[in-house]
Amino acid sequence: NGYDRYNFTFRNTTSFLGDKLKLDVGASYVMQKDRNMTNQGTYNNPLVGAYVYPRGNDWADIEMYERYDPARRLYTQYWPVGDAGMTMQNPYWINYRNLRENNKDRYMLNAALSYDVLDWLNVSGRLRIDNSNNDYTEKFYASTFTQLTEGSKNGLYGITKTKDKQVYGDVLVNINKTFGEDWSLQANAGASISDMRYDAMKVRGPIPDGEITDEKPLLANVFSVQNLSNTSKTKRLQEGWREQTQSIFASVEIGFKNTYFLTLTGRNDWPSQLAGEHSVKSSFFYPSVGASVVLSQLIPEMPKNLSYVKLRASYA
């Protein structure tokens, strides 16, 4: 098997207007390739054949995992042990002739902008994009165990292309202010949007060998969509989905003498799953209320091993 991954990252933080305006941007790109990652179970697992291979047999004999077949005019799997009812194959054949390859490209972009309107008032916004493209291929060469190739002796080919797109953005107003020596106010209010999309196209099927169907045999070990069976044994699938959630939210906490606190929060979501004509409601709201008291501020002399005690109750 093999695994390669390369990461490229960029980030820059800048301040303007006497440090009142701050901009933070970043970008990442990930390129990943892997082949024949470890597989559990018996299918496509070289460890099964390696474990049960008779100790008295010459291991070097199966290292030459394929032999030329004059009748078929191609190289076929050499595995004198047989499948033993366990779908076993030559471990080397699995590694080099049952190829499962994955190529993934992913890029992530993010930006955050923050502005201090006053010393107690801040406005900020964030945007994050995370997109990835993935290509997964299966190439099972001729003479692979037919249970893995939909019954064909000429092999199997499959390709799956997927795209994932995620976008998230929010805006937020933050307040942190004191009134005299006793009262304090911490509050924030904002809105956010989350959008996710997924698209996939998949084609997977056997290369006709003239036996499993009435089709004429096609070239073995030619891995292309045009070389696959036109029967129901070839699976062709296109699917995708999209979901989006729009939200508004706010929270307020009022403090007195840094001892007593009252907290109120509320959030309303509009998920796309509830946007259908048969939905009873298109959104849902969930509030909460809480109160707390710092007992350690009220107790004159706290024990040395106990410096902070807080009692809190909330309802949501």
Feature annotation, model-predicted:
Residues 5-9, 267, 288, 310-312:
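Short, cationic motifs built from Arg/Lys/His that form the positively charged side of catalytic pockets
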Residues 10-14, 111-115, 171-175, 189, ...:
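Residues on the lipid-exposed face of transmembrane beta-strands in outer-membrane beta-barrel proteins
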Residues 13-106, 124-246, 273-280, 295-316:
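Surface-exposed loop/interface segments of Gram-negative outer-membrane beta-barrel transport/assembly proteins
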Residues 243-247, 254-259:
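Short, flexible loop/turn motifs enriched in small residues
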Residues 269-271:
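Active-site beta-loop-alpha junctions of metal-dependent nucleic acid enzymes
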Residues 277, 284-288:
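Outer-membrane beta-barrel domain signature, especially the mid-to-C-terminal portions
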